[in-house]
Amino acid sequence: MIWDYRAPWWLPGGNFQTIYAAKLARRYSGHKPQWSRERWDTPDSDFVDVDWRVEESPLTEDAPLFVLFHGLEGSSSSHYAEAFAEETRARGWRMAVPHFRGCSGEINWAPRAYHSGDFEEIAWMLSRLRQQHSGPIYAVGISLGGNALMRWAGEMGHAAAQVVNGVVSVCSPVDLTASGHAIDTGLNKAIYARMFLATMKPRAMQKLQQFPGLFDPLELMAANTLYAFDNVFTAPLHGFRGTDDYWDRASAKPGLSRVQVPALVLNARNDPFIPASSLPTQDQVSDHVTLWQPNTGGHVGFASGRFPGDLKEMPWAVSEWMTQHG
């Protein structure tokens, strides 16, 4: 199966395709997805919140479980989560959205947050879900969540198949250095970096109130790029020497050649966050990895149909790939 997405004529350009999908396109045709929340204790005495889509009718015990790992500053309320909720409901699949630390609306307890290469977090979450669920498990990561998921798949090798039936990354920055510099440059810096920092800085300051002296607040508030923010906050809190070390060691791209479970890596070539030149090529990945690289779609955009459009096509294509390969 190959999905060759083409943006509708009325939705030109990567930036427009990105912003429109997140803010204006229809996410679902029926009722807004409802979620039931579980709180899990973590191995390091912290917590994460996992949202389960509320089922309209009972599902069989062996129904597939669709696990969605969200992107930077995402949640179960993100446009892609609600679009996938509709698609998986129609297929009779369960759906869970495990939130990364601090992303569920409540600050976490430990002196840490989340990061792009957090494959250890992915590992224990998926292990717990495997213990609870007897049917197939399909794991999908969006943007940051997809990089972390593919890092996990690369680290696990053959053992990943004992946990999941397939993995998918959607618009994930598998080369974090290339993507980080792209977001911090020009129009991207003015739009996207500013948008992310507007929520990331207050959250970091909440962490400083919990743990005085954790970082320099003046340096953090002066950060006007993701590089500077990661250098002050993300990298040191998670065991990296600095941003360069973090972006290098956390990138999933070098590990794609070690993936031994059915995997799909989907990236639009006009994604404003991810330079097309940094995308993986077939000779850089294992035989288990399928690459979809449509020319359009933006960053987790992929709206389709007549104006005003909807977000059905990408979740359908990803789910269909899962049924054929997972």
Task: Enumerate the predicted regions with their spans.
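Alpha/beta-hydrolase-fold enzymes
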Residues: H133-L237
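Short beta-strand/loop motif that positions the catalytic acidic residue
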Residues: V259, V265-N267, D271
